[in-house]
Amino acid sequence: SYLALPNFKANHRKVLITDNAEGFHALVTSANPHDGSSRHSNIGLRFGGPAVADLLLSERAVLAMSGADTEVVDEMISSLPQAAAGIASLDTIQVVTESAIRTTARDIIGTAKAGDRLDLAMFYLSHRTLLEELKEAHERGVEVRILLDANNDAFGMEKSGIPNRQSAMELNGAGITVRWCNTEGEQCHSKLLLRRDSHGNAQLLLGSANFTR
């Protein structure tokens, strides 16, 4: 109904979980797996280890909410502690979904200090809270670099540049470096936020979520 439309929510996740003789692996990406998006630039992260179980649990919640049978997924989850494939590393992975994505982005930006650098590549950027956090980080002496899609095209149709042109104007007015992807009909479809501190430590947030409300 029209009354339900304001609460409409699509499943925007792009997740692949596979298994082989070495165990389970996961891919989280910004890419839509269809030919209409084949020219778009995207990003993805492939990983193993306990985080695969966290990802499966988040997908199981969606299945349960939809009334689907979760028996097969439950069996996979029960075997993951022994079967999850991981690479020995000091890196850590955390799976975040829904509003936790905004909270994590806000934390990454908000805790950046003078001498740190924030690199943001985003298909859609318009969330007021995050725009304010970016401007405040710049004022604290954080180097902020932003790469945006110009929002000119979508599947062969011309667009008006909303929302990125308005956001870029605001950020540029605050003194933040904003650059446009050099697209020719395709989309700069990546969604990533990278923070590097003065010691070379890095914190990366990526996936399918745009920074919009």
Could you describe each region identified by the protein language model?
Residues S1-G23, D35-H40, R46-A53, L57-A64, ...:
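PLD/PLD-like phosphodiesterase catalytic module centered on the HKD motif
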Residues F47-P50, A61-T104:
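Active-site cores of enzymes that catalyze phosphoryl transfer or operate on phosphate-rich substrates
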